[in-house]
Amino acid sequence: MASGQREAERSAKAERAEAAASLAAEDLKDINKGDVTYKLTERTTTTEPERPGLIGSVMKAVQGTKDAVIGKSHDTAESTREGADIASEKAAGMRDTTGEVRDSTAQKTKETADYTADKAREAKDKTADKTKETADYAAEKAREAKDRTADKTKETAEYTAEKAREAKDKTADKLGEYKDYTAEKAKEAKDTTAEKLGEYKDYTVDKAKEAKDKTAEKAKETAEYTSDKARETKDKTAEKVGEYKDYTAEKAKETADKAREAKDKTAEKVGEYRDYTAEKATETKDAGVSKIGELKDSAVDTAKRAMGFLSGKTEETKQKAVETKDTAKEKMDEAGEEARRKMEEMRLEGKKLDEDASRKTQQSTESAADKAHETKDSVAQRGEEGKGSIMGALGNMTGAIKSKLTGATTPSDEETRASAHGDESTGKTVVAVDVKDTRPGYVATVLKEADQMTGQTFNDVGEIDDEEKVRIVVGEKKL
């Protein structure tokens, strides 16, 4: 505790000494600059009360400085030594504290300088009145103060330089120690770092080895898993392919069954249409036989009734009868040919249906049914057309024979001239049949041949007595 107080007192004394030295230095600086002027005047004997003037104030300040610097040299020296010891002790680890003290000292010096400047300005104002009396004294005192201040400044400078050298040496020693300490620490850090790097290197190698082993193990597991999955996928794919194969075979079988069913249905439909066509042809044939039978009966009856009428005809009538016979034969031949052509067309139509059915067995049942239906309509229509053509030709022939055999009119010259060929102006066809030059039973034979050509037959009525030429005029029916 006591040592701490002594150190505090020493520090305070050192600060006071530095402040006093700074103040004296500032005063000396002002004097050297010549800011203070002196004026010599005559000295009078007037006694005035003594009072301190500018010089007195300066001298008082200098005296205080002298007492502080010289009069208390022992204390100052002791304080200085103590301060030096303290500075030496603190130089190693308290460089920052020294900087703070230096800053504080500079601040104090500045404050003292400001205060001295203020006082100097005040003294300057008062000096104007006191210059005459105190000029010589002031000059002398100034010289003395200058000399003393110079000595003190020199001593202070030497002391400061010495202390600076000592501080420099101590600082160098400390810096050397710090340098050695830093080098040692750097070496230790380097060794520690190398050791740590070795440990890290070994650790990294171990970790890399472990990672490599784990990677190899994972790769092996992944390969095994991939292989298992590939086998499973292959098995599933094979199973699916088998299922799809079975499904495709089943669908192909179903398609073939449906095609066979469609083919059977189409064949059945074609058979039905063929039966229908044959039935229609049979009906047409029966109708033709019936019509020809009727025509035969009508012609025989008419011929018998007209025998008396025909027996009295002239040679012209016989010639016309011959022409009528030839024309009737041609008409019968044409009718038979037309009947054969229609039958051939129906046969070719049935054959075409068979070929169409063979080509379209792969089509759907609905399309086959539609086509069969259309074919049925076409066959029916063609059967009706054939039936109408045959019946129309036979009807026209029957009507012409009936109309002419039952009539009693005598042909005119115009009709006679047109007997060899049709009369275009009247729209009638003249047929001349030569009965005289024809053997007995010729008409019946012609009709029988016509029936045989069309696949029909009828009973022969025998020969017709007194056959002569018959002129038959077939007239076209006008609409």
From Swiss-Prot:
Keywords, comma-separated and alphabetical = Coiled coil
**Coiled-coil stretches, from where to where?**
318-356
User: Which segments carry the region annotation Disordered?
Assistant: 71-169, 210-237, 310-433
In terms of domain of life, where is this protein from? Eukaryota
Q: Name one Pfam family in it.
A: LEA_4
Q: What is this protein called?
A: Late embryogenesis abundant protein At3g53040
Q: Which family does it belong to?
A: Belongs to the LEA type 4 family.
Expressed, tissue-wise, as follows: Highly expressed in the epidermal abscission zone cells from flowers and siliques. Expressed in roots, vasculature of cotyledons and leaves, stigmas, anther filaments and pollen grains.
Biased composition regions of type Basic and acidic residues, renumbered to the chain: 72-88, 97-169, 313-359, 368-387, 414-426
Signal peptide extent: none
GO biological process: what's one of them? floral organ abscission
Which function does this protein serve?
A: May function in the proximal abscission zone cells to prevent water loss after floral organ shedding. May be involved in the reestablishment of desiccation tolerance in germinated seeds.
